[in-house]
């Protein structure tokens, strides 16, 4: 019997089932502790083009020794396995055909390996997709998403019913054109941009390894699950996959098993036109165990043996190269790029049905297949119930560790965590906001169990080291400093995986703000997939000085303000930095970017942690009746300039309001009344100042206001000289204000 605390933990996890649109009717998930346990082969012909292409291909790339794979005995009836595999194929074919859009080739080729994974290997509870100790699966080749939807449907997930398959790629459906974790319970990560999925999988596997090292005991391995992924040639070509797989090998992520769909076909044709490297040897060099399944089309025992071998290797991740035929079973399109991203067409669908001996109507699941897969509901319930009992015993014996683990699993922050954040007064010493950020990071790491992160080889510049913890490494996975090396893109995507593993994981990652250009795709996926990663971006302007325009961000603030579901903070001092972290920690479905200075800044009068929650607020004002002569608006290092310009104008008898615009997105969320109290509509004299692009400031200052900024690239010179030459000065702001009054 699960403990009361375990029941509460179950209830806390139910919130994960609520879709991003706020509906609570998207999926029905009972509390996991309440679930009770109940207890001749069609080979198909292969296009001769596959054999010819294979011959050409292997003449150009060196043969790779296949790891030994033993024949194993399975209890599954081979004819039923064939039938189940073909069910997966035809659910994908039929859905793509009905939508007149999609990618049937990958599901047709990968159906055997995915069937064995979902039906024979993975542990999960289809009635609670968010059960903590489930195995995770990430379809990195996200265009083949009908493969995963078919699997979820057969496994009994309520999120993918027959009507959902029939509405594939349609408005409002639970089966979008690429996997979306926020739309479809059972989907772990949002994939589609190639390489992002395997990177997320590395993050998920890192999270498991970290939690296992922290919380497992000799008598109770409370954290014990695998991460599986399917990636294709396109994922392999993308640079991000090499970045993250290099780290996975370095970290020894033994519970990460990736299936490489080796079908030799890309959108433009055979991969020989652009991709002839030995993937096997590359992964061996990256520190992976490599297995080659030569017959991925129907070599079920080979696949089973490969998985068994992969699980036996505990000190490194495994790549299982599975040679498949894209569009397997299609007489005229198999092994062709034409089957990659378009419906087969009515005639070819019929020909494929005949070829594979499939007499059923579209979307039909044969009764014996349905009956076979139905066991996953009671088996999944039993798995979760067993784990609940295990957790109850763990909690009784190890209450402190259990409390920390529950916080990470549920996302419930410890009581009073925010009190750990530092506060400042105007008399506190001035400092660069990157240094003030480090104080916040270290305070949060001590107060929040799931807080961890690192930098892309710039920890000493980004100031992101957690002083109370060591480095997460192969031998010390319990530590919380992540060393990503110079791999910005991979870093961001790995952090997405960590954030998506459990609601209480709060990963941060860091580099120079300008190098977000190397990781923008991962940051966009953060926003789309509602992964609350904290991006610590230092050296946020020309204020970094002599390194010059290659390192000086200009358009970056504007670009992130334009990105949906991301908060762009530019704090001016210690209180605003702490306030930004407070919000970033609590907003678990929205990533945050903190743009931080290299140069020292003063602690300003009028700032506060609490005020940051408004996004924009008044820090000083000598006007009456909410009608200042002019409003000066600044962010970050330029808020000090706005404050000093205000003093100059006040000396000349002007009434001036100074507004900190630390986060546009939060200001947009405020009531109209609050916005009017800060930026009264009848005060058109407004001047903004920011050491970056002026793009977008028009909506803040209005048609009659002025924006001071930089709309060219920077230059190499000392910071003070740059500010003067680019006109980011007190004098420029005073003159602009006077011209409007």
From Swiss-Prot:
GO molecular function: metal ion binding; transketolase activity
Alphabetical keyword list: Acetylation, Calcium, Chloroplast, Magnesium, Membrane, Metal-binding, Phosphoprotein, Plastid, Thiamine pyrophosphate, Thylakoid, Transferase, Transit peptide
Swiss-Prot/TrEMBL site (Important for catalytic activity) positions: 103, 340
Broad EC category: transferase
Binding site for Mg(2+): 233, 263, 265
Co-factor requirement: Mg(2+); Ca(2+); Mn(2+); Co(2+)
BP GO annotations: reductive pentose-phosphate cycle
Main location: plastid
CDD domains found in the cross-reference section: TPP_PYR_DXS_TK_like (cd07033), TPP_TK (cd02012)
NCBIfam families given in the database record: tktlase_bact
Oligomeric and partner information: Homodimer.
The protein, known as: Transketolase-2, chloroplastic
